[in-house]
Amino acid sequence: MEKQIDTDRSFKKLTVRLKWRCWKRRILTAGVAAMVMIGIMSAFWWWEQEGITVPESAGQPGIKPGGNCAVLVLGNGCRVDLQKDCDTLQLPGISWDHRKGTIVYDGRENKTGWPERNTLMVPLRGEYRLVLGDGTKVWLNSASSLNYPVQFAEKERCVELDGEAYFEVTPDPERPFIVKSGDVQTRVLGTAFNFSAYRGENASTITLLTGKVAVSAPGHAERVLLPGQQLKYDAENRKTVIKEVDAEDFVVWKDGLFLFNDCGLEEIIPRLSRWYGVTFHYDREKFGDLKFYIKTRRYEDIGTILNLLKLTENVTYSIEGNEVTLYRTGENK
């Protein structure tokens, strides 16, 4: 069964496709398995060379989406709010455009007194783009931080990540680019990849788009990834799994999109929580059999994506302040 619904007149050719299959009850079984497929097609928002300008939200009033927000911590401990201080503070060799959420380091400058390492911190409901001194481009997702040298050393380029980032590494065969996150280390020469390793979550995930990377983790020999491969390391049981994926699905967040492909709520909720800065409440057991396909813009109010979940006729919700509660349809609130 397929339905087409005009969910927002402000966007032309906006299509919602709803498919579901109800599995028949079988003798001695107590549950019903369901697969829900929701697709949404809307305008794409692409990064310009210098960054992206976040559009006005066109969603219903409610909890607003995130946007360009970051704090730059200098080597001497000084903190620069890139939203408030960007028009008044000047630093040698560093420029930024907060409207486009971009900070750029000029690697040609090396002045005495420069801090050795900086940290770019992106809070909940934030995102930012960084161009390092070697020209490497980094997109930082919400609730993430990157520690890096103002100028890289002669033998290697090493950064430390907490959270999620997409890297487009400038090739330099003489200086491998190394990303460290906890016990996991990724070494590249020049490539594009996504690295997700949030503190408090057991899994670290590296997804390769182009080039080649070598990943090392405790208890495992170095593993080499090829384009279209994803490595997931479970820190709790120290297991590593490599599988083939559509790598583009894992980096569309940098282009202003949410894409959940055959995902359960346990995968969807953390991303929504970080981006909208809200707390979700739901009974995992009641939603364990549901999988979703959702594609929509990140810059809509939270009600837009919650209403997409509601279209499945399996999910309802309530919002109170910054807390969202999800219910299985028919469940008493």
What is the meaning of each model-derived region?
Residues 1-13:
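A short, acidic loop/turn at secondary-structure junctions
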Residues 14, 18-19, 23-32, 42-333:
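A residue-level detector for the "anchor" residue at the start of short, highly conserved motifs
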Residues 33-37:
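N-terminal low-complexity or simple alpha-helical regulatory segments
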